[in-house]
């Protein structure tokens, strides 16, 4: 068994690559001063807020908060585990990882031997089923069916479509011959166990569509029955390696085209993706016939534009609405392509051809236009009550638009269609927005978004951030802060980051923000990269350092002062003036101490 990659080897890889070169393969970067800037690949934006520091070998997006080092970037952009990212960067750095081959080849540090066996078994059966389909008489009927519906040999090979034979024990015999545990294969969803103890294949006499996770591992199948009968489709169950709601079909292959176009085409089924790809649309992915889950939506969040092209029937239109609501709530720009006659993308391509479908997908409507059309369905707009209800619902959707120009465009449409005053619609919209817009406290533990102007942060929070920035760049400052403050930072994330900084220097390292960030857990890396990019002087004066420390240590005292103020007010309300006077005296003493500290 291989060993984990030692810290010194990881450090050699980190020093052997330039993060600007690594990120430059994915993002167009332009130098501005000491750093490079570009459009963030993790969220859609028009103005570059993605910063790369060649000096510190880190990146940070001031728009969405993503941040880290070269390892983090590759893991996030490609959806790969740390060891795979290390392997790729080691090749660039000229660092030999052959001694650690087993660990590097393992796709996930935390993956169990059982889970690895499951993915290997899926890969074996995928090759077996594909071979049967394209190279044997047994699979000829299935191959004829696929080609009759318009899929070429190249498309069948590209999607590794296969055929599972009708023989009950074919899969079990193959897996057993390769030393796979049959009980584990049952747990993997590839076999079922009969009452007599025999194991038989879950998929029989079916056209097989392999399902890959976002790293390209085969983790499941969907099998379509060849001929008549029920059930028409049999799908892999939920297993340790397959969670349907966490995977978008074909995303592993479409990731690069999606990133290049900054657009994804979201469809419902396997056949829709395959037909779209054959038509030249290689940025299509599918929810595999289920409603879009929150996990799937978050996968698409970095994409600039998501075009939804679901089935044109009522169920498809309602599913498109639900998916659009979920994606737009995450800040995605959503458009909707509606196909005529209730057709789905696969049917449309078979009837009208791929070129015409590409045109339909290109003529997608903005989300608000789709929603306004959806809201009209089933309403008699000649009826005053239903007409007013439609206008009210449409105004709610228009009010969600951030662009005043877009708002005005749709308001004018409403005004013209229903002979309404534009000023009246503007007034109604403003009134609705005022009613909906109320101050909302962030949930517990939620930190301020990075785009928040730093000057709006409380003084103690700014002080903590600046202290952490100086600590990352100076061992001496870190030692002073450790002695004076220790773990008494007021914000939990700041306390955690400070603890890692203390440990970093205690291990004997010199100041190196990039090396430090590589040792920090992923959830803290965006904060660390953000803090390390703060514009601060190379040296901090004793007075400045003292001021920061004072702000941090005085924060609990100011909070206590507020508590005393509430206690005094409560005593006065009870007409307990003696207690109120005593508390007032305590408050005066506390304020004196705070002003002198």
From Swiss-Prot:
Binding residues for Mg(2+) 2: 311, 313
Domain of life from the UniProt record: Bacteria
Entry-linked PROSITE patterns: TOPRIM (PS50880)
Cofactor(s) needed: Zn(2+); Mg(2+)
Cited CDD domains: TOPRIM_DnaG_primases
SUPFAM superfamilies (UniProt xref): DNA primase core, N-terminal domain of DnaB helicase, Zinc beta-ribbon
Function description: RNA polymerase that catalyzes the synthesis of short RNA molecules used as primers for DNA polymerase during DNA replication.
Protein family: Belongs to the DnaG primase family.
Protein name from the UniProt record: DNA primase
């Amino acid at each position: 068994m291989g060993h984990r990659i030692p810290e010194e080897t990881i450090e050699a890889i980190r020093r052997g690559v330039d993060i600007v070169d690594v990120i430059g393969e994915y993002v167009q970067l332009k130098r501005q001063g000491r750093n490079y800037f570009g459009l963030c690949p993790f969220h859609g934006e028009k103005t570059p807020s993605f910063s790369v520091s060649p000096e510190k070998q880190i990146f940070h997006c001031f728009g969405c908060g993503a941040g880290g080092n070269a390892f983090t970037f590759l893991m996030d952009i490609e959806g790969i585990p740390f060891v795979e990212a290390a392997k790729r960067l080691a090749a660039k750095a000229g660092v030999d990882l052959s001694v650690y081959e087993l660990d590097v080849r393992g796709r996930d540090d935390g993956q169990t031997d059982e889970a690895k066996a499951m993915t290997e078994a899926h890969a074996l059966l995928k090759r077996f089923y594909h071979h049967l389909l394209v190279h044997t008489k047994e699979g000829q009927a299935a191959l004829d069916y696929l080609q009759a519906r318009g899929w070429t040999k190249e498309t069948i090979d590209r999607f590794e479509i296969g055929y599972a034979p009708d023989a009950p024990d074919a899969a079990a015999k193959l897996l057993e011959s390769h030393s796979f545990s049959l009980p584990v294969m049952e747990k993997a969803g590839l076999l079922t166990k009969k009452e007599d103890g025999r194991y038989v294949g879950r998929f029989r006499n079916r056209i097989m569509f392999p399902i890959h996770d976002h790293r390209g591992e085969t983790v499941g199948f969907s099998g379509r029955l060849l001929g008549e009968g029920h059930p028409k489709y049999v799908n892999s169950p939920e297993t340790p390696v397959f969670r349907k709601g966490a995977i978008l079909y074909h995303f592993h292959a479409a990731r690069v085209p999606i990133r290049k176009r900054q657009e994804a085409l979201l469809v419902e089924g396997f056949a829709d993706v395959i037909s779209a790809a054959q038509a030249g649309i290689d940025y299509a992915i599918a929810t595999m016939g289920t409603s879009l889950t929150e996990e799937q939506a978050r996968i698409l969040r970095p994409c600039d534009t998501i075009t939804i092209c679901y089935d044109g029937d009522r169920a498809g239109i309602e599913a498109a609405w639900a998916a659009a609501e979920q994606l737009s709530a995450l800040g995605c720009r959503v458009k909707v392509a509606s196909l005529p006659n209730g057709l789905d993308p696969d049917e449309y391509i078979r009837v009208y051809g791929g070129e015409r479908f590409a045109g339909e997908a290109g003529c997608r409507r903005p989300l608000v236009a789709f929603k306004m059309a959806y809201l009209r369905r089933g309403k008699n707009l000649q009826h005053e009550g239903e007409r007013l209800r439609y206008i009210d619902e449409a105004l709610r959707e228009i009010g969600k638009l951030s662009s005043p120009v877009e708002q005005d465009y749709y308001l004018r449409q409403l005004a013209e269609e229903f002979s309404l005053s534009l000023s009246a619609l503007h007034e109604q919209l403003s009134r609705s927005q005022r009613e909906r817009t109320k101050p909302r406290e962030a949930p517990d533990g939620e930190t301020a978004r990075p785009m928040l102007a730093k000057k709006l942060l409380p003084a103690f929070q700014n002080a903590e951030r600046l202290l952490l920035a100086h600590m990352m760049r100076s061992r001496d400052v870190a030692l002073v802060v450790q002695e004076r403050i220790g773990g008494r930072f007021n914000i939990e994330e700041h306390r955690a980051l400070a603890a890692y900084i203390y440990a970093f220097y205690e291990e004997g390292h010199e100041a190196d923000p990039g090396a430090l960030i590589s040792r920090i857990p992923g959830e803290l890396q965006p904060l660390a990269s953000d803090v390390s990019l703060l514009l601060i002087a190379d040296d901090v004066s004793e007075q400045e350092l003292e001021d920061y420390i004072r702000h941090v240590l005085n924060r609990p005292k100011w909070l206590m002062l507020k508590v005393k103020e509430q206690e005094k007010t409560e005593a006065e309300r009870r007409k307990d003036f003696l207690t109120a006077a005593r508390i007032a005296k305590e408050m005066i003493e506390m304020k004196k101490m705070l002003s002198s500290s």
